Structure formats: structure tokens, C-alpha cells
Amino acid sequence: MKERSITINAGNLSIDATLNETEMAEQIWNSLPLSGAANIWGDEIYFDIPVSATEHSEASDLVSSGDIAFWPPGDAFCIFFGRTPASTDDKPRAASAVNVFGHISGDEKLFRGVNGGTEISIVVKG
């Protein structure tokens, strides 16, 4: 399968990410472009998107910094870049199980400069 790359724009910040080869990644890819207002939860940005999905078999609340995921209870696109209020160590932890569908290609810590309410857009890279 051809590598699928996206660009995440948040204010003056543009960071690329690569989607994995999962059903969730396919659903996100087919829904692009996406946009919404950033919600901040610790070192996580999330926003509602017009996509619905259930938890996949590999869904987990344990994620890695730089993971991008879909949160089924909130129909939300999530970007993890550090500790969240649910973390028990230095790793991010989602509020509940998420479907990870990709990973940030650059420095995910740059998302710390994004404020709540900032418009986020997700587009096909290029």
C-alpha cells in the first residue's frame, strides 16, 4: 500500500504525519480534509470530526507521544504529545480506548504551543 501522509495545520504550525495501514486510517483518509477547534487535555489536542467508528480490537488507552488516534465516544481526532490528566507515568494516556491510526513525523512537542480554540485542519500532504 502506498504511504499516506497528512499535514496537520494549527495556527502557524504545520506538522506532517503518516497514517498506518488500518481500517481506521482508511476511514480518516477518505474523510479528508477535516477541521475543527482545538480542545486541550494535558498534552493532547482533540476535536470533533464527522466520522463515527467503534473501538477496534487493538484499541487501547495506552498510547505513545506522537500518536494520532480516533476517540470513539467523542468522534474525535486526537493528537498525543505528552502526559495527559489520565497518565500514571511520563507517557500519554487517553481518557478511554482510542484507535491509533498514525504517527507524527516531526516534533510532536511543538503542539504544546497550540491554544484551546485554535482552528486545526488536516489535509493530504502535498
Protein language model regions, located:
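Surface loops and adjacent helix of pleckstrin homology
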Residues: N20, G82, K125
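Short, basic/aromatic beta-hairpin or loop at an interaction surface
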Residues: G36-P50, T88-H103
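Long, hydrophobic N-terminal alpha-helical segment
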Residues: M1-S35
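Compact, glycine-rich, soluble single-domain proteins
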Residues: S31, N39-S65, W71
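Mid-chain, well-packed structural core segment of small domains
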Residues: E58-N99
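Extended, low-hydrophobicity, polar/charged segments
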Residues: G11, S35-A37, D48-T54, D61, ...
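Well-ordered alpha/beta subsegment
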Residues: M1-E3, R93-G126
